[in-house]
């Protein structure tokens, strides 16, 4: 019995030990944040740079026009490389994404509101929530507080501001233009063509196809360059990440594994590598232990930070994340005037147009320059009417769309735009509707009466003509019977002697009855 009790006690102790190890294993999953690669001295409480804030004006930057849409083209290409840099083997990933306006996003740590909450999260956690196909760590942040540094615009939401401090920026404007370089606060806040995605890095690596590191060092931080720390940040080998675009306007993400001062690459080597990949503009993002690459929600890189158990390496909880996802509509809700289908807005209504369903189009005539195009059609100016506002108001009406009747004396017409009564147009006065109706009825009845009278007279004339003709024919027939044809036969005596009257008639006398 004692033996079984002892065995049970040992079993319980073993189980307790297993659970303790398991809990310890969970604790060991947290990064120690020990591979730090900072561009500026850690002891100095400062924002990303000490240089003067630029509130207004145009700063040096490059704008690349949005690439044309290529239906059916592959949206994402991820290449894995192992390259040698001065006899050092370096592994990493190069990602290209077409149509960055619809396939790329800057994400706050852990989702929307992460910067305001000063939240930190691993790239995996943030990427899974946003369905990222490829994700990397993004901009710089304060290790002790989690504060997002620099400018951050995430899906059109401005969540962090640098206040005009001049660090390298990469962003996408609403029309798809890719912007790389230095921006004033005024340019960041532009509302005519605002940024939909924007984040800050440190060091402009490549500008318009040329390495720009020296110029960037002088521009971004004069004072810290003297301390040597910024120079070390540029030249030390470490894990690195970058973002930019190529000549086709495709988004390019770069990631290289490493550990500060032990393995990896420096900024010069990274810039040269990117140039060989036809990258035109690129900036450097957070590196060192922050460098993380996640593919389809799974960690695909080798972190340099140690876990709580030094035997293992763990991904660091970082701030912003750059994400490549399936094509999305821009904006996702199509401005409330359409439905997003396969990354393209299908606009509702008859007049909403444009990639984001935010443009009103009332046809080629554009309301004939006499009205305003609205979501229900043309809203005509005063004095005009019709579906495209091409018709002037009829007499007696005025105002927008000719919806108001004139109120002039004697029903005179008014100005079709203002409704003012015009004395010079008295001759064009209109009759009252009742008078017009009575006149119309009278005219109608008069025409009907005249038509009936004309038909009656014609009928009587026809009857009279027929009667006269019948009477004439009847009289002719009677005369023919009374004075019909006959032959004259002279009378003779029975003895063959002529009558005495015939004898007495002279030979030259004319006999009217003789042929």
From Swiss-Prot:
Record's signal peptide? 1-25
Q: Which modifications occur after translation, per UniProt?
A: The precursor is cleaved and activated in the trans-Golgi network by a furin endopeptidase.
Keywords, A to Z, come to: Disulfide bond, EGF-like domain, Glycoprotein, Golgi apparatus, Hydrolase, Membrane, Signal, Transmembrane, Transmembrane helix, Zymogen
Its pathway is: Protein modification; protein glycosylation
The way this protein sits in the membrane is described as: Single-pass type I membrane protein
Record PANTHER family: N-ACETYLGLUCOSAMINE-1-PHOSPHODIESTER ALPHA-N-ACETYLGLUCOSAMINIDASE
The protein, known as: N-acetylglucosamine-1-phosphodiester alpha-N-acetylglucosaminidase
> Where does this protein come from, organism-wise?
Homo sapiens (Human)
What would be the name of the gene that encodes this protein?
NAGPA
